[in-house]
Amino acid sequence: MNNGMQIFDYEDIQMIPNKCVVQSRKEVDTSVKFGPHTFKIPVVPANMQTIIDEPLAIWLAEHDYFYIMHRFQPERRMDFVRDMKKRGLIASISVGVKDDEFDFIEALAANELTPDYITIDIAHGYAQVVIDMIQHIKHYLPNAFVIAGNVGTPEAVRELENAGADATKVGIGPGKVCITKLKTGFGTGGWQLAAVRWCAKAARKPIIADGGIRNNGDIAKSIRFGATMCMIGSLFAGHEETPGKHVNIDGKEYQEYYGSASEYQKGTHHNVEGKKILLPVKGKIGDTLKEMQEDLQSAVSYAGGRDLESLTKVDYVIVKNSIFNGDQY
């Protein structure tokens, strides 16, 4: 690793404004082309069981937002892809790397079902079995757009891209309900934004910044440092449409939010790298997505541009932890 590399996270960065060239932020185009499709904003809700389910996936696809369906109801995936295709919507699913997942890819091909997007979703994505899965998908479903992760180094990005991945997901344990850094001593928690920058410099294909985003301004910062798309969990948790279990405490409504490697997800205490928290229920997800878009439009206006490209060129300063601690919410 480069010892001269700048280490920072979202709360350590402030971008420096340029002259505004739009009359209104409504003129700003926040759309992003990711693979074969274009989406309203460079944001995707995390593919976690407390964040996304089939009705929400349909709603997101109908409204031109990117989504990735989680992989924790494997028996539903074939029908889900078929249903989305019948609706004329994009089909975007997740797979793991166990033997039956390789069989599932072959079954999709046998049924002549090609999802638009397939995300290989494991905690430590820099692994031979992930490379094997990328090549397996590309052999049986050559037209699927393959997202592979998660990784945290340029070497991993290059190797997964060379294996055939169309995009890589960067982030090892920076999420709000991920405790990888505490359980293992490894990860990008505390320097996730620097890791995104480090990986993006090596990437030839799109990067998804996954985890550690606590505020809408962090989306703009992710774009500045090379991400094409941002995966977000905690900001989407606790909405009326998200599928986490509701809990009433002293008359207040909360929703469960837990990590994909938590014991609540796994149903076992073995190899746990996630935890469960309760978040206040906070209204409709459409309102949050609209607010994200408006804040991103404002960010682009501060960058002196009309679209997301302008964010990639702005100057910035590192102000170590002087704004606030990103976990205060």
From Swiss-Prot:
Gene Ontology biological process terms from the UniProt entry:
purine nucleotide metabolic process
Q: Where does NADP(+) bind?
A: 207-230
Tell me what reaction this enzyme catalyses.
Answer: IMP + NH4(+) + NADP(+) = GMP + NADPH + 2 H(+)
Superkingdom of origin: Bacteria
Q: Which PROSITE patterns match?
A: IMP_DH_GMP_RED
Enzyme class comes to: oxidoreductase
Q: Which InterPro entries does the UniProt record give?
A: Aldolase_TIM, GMP_reductase, GuaC_type_2, IMP_DH/GMP_Rdtase_CS, IMP_DH_GMPRt
Q: Which HAMAP family match?
A: GMP_reduct_type2
Known role: Catalyzes the irreversible NADPH-dependent deamination of GMP to IMP. It functions in the conversion of nucleobase, nucleoside and nucleotide derivatives of G to A nucleotides, and in maintaining the intracellular balance of A and G nucleotides.
GO terms under cellular component:
cytosol; GMP reductase complex
User: What GO MF terms are annotated?
Assistant: GMP reductase activity
Q: Which keywords annotate this record?
A: NADP, Oxidoreductase
Q: Please state what the protein is called.
A: GMP reductase
Q: Where is the active site?
A: 178
Q: Which family does it belong to?
A: Belongs to the IMPDH/GMPR family. GuaC type 2 subfamily.
